[in-house]
Amino acid sequence: MSSIRNTGSPENSYLDAALECILDVGVKRTTITDIARRAGVARMTIYRKWPDMLTLLGDLMVREWLAEAAELRPDEAAAPVDAESLAQNVVDVCRSMRNNAFFCKIVDVDPEFLIPYIFYRRGRTQDALLSMIRGFLQVGQESGTVRAGDPAVMARSILLTTLGFTLSMRTMTDEVKPAELDAELSLQLQRYLAP
């Protein structure tokens, strides 16, 4: 599982402890006290870094979900960015997110924590994903392998499209398999991006 990423820093060990607590009981039932106990530190140690559980949760979401995206990014030096590879990369990240234990726990137990990021504002993870997608679009446009267009608008369109496939896939798999829907998403994105 890619979710335990302790790089040796105290902050990461506290986030690891938070992740373990959330995977056990969900966000609403996890407290700073639980996290401190699991991390083997005093509550005030955690409070010095995060004033409340929501701030800590935000940092944990950014760390975990950007790690999913970073692991699946194509190697820009090894392969050109074209419509097909970019579409497949986006589908892979979407699938990886749907299968991420932390993401699944929030969707299953505490989905209300995602509502602000769906209806009201972008989060840091979404901003980072937009920047990443925009960068790939620019590389593909410069080489002529991705259609012309404003990369900022195109990145937002791609992210909006994939949000439905990430958040609502479970509601559409009663008669079809997730792999079939992923193939359709890939086709949509390839046609959207093709020069």
What label would you give each PLM region?
Residues 74, 107-116:
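Short linear capping/connector segments at secondary-structure termini
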Residues 15, 87, 91, 130, ...:
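An amphipathic alpha-helix signature
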Residues 13, 21-55, 59:
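Helix-turn-helix
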Residues 1-9, 142:
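N-terminal intrinsically disordered/low-complexity leader segments
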Residues 9-19, 35, 60-68, 72, ...:
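Generic hydrophobic, amphipathic alpha-helix propensity
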Residues 69-70, 116-143, 152-156:
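Amphipathic alpha-helical packing segments from all-alpha helical-bundle domains
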Residues 59, 73-102, 154-158, 182:
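Hydrophobic alpha-helical connector segments
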Residues 104-109, 142-188:
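Hydrophobic/aromatic-rich alpha-helical bundle segments in the mid-to-C-terminal region
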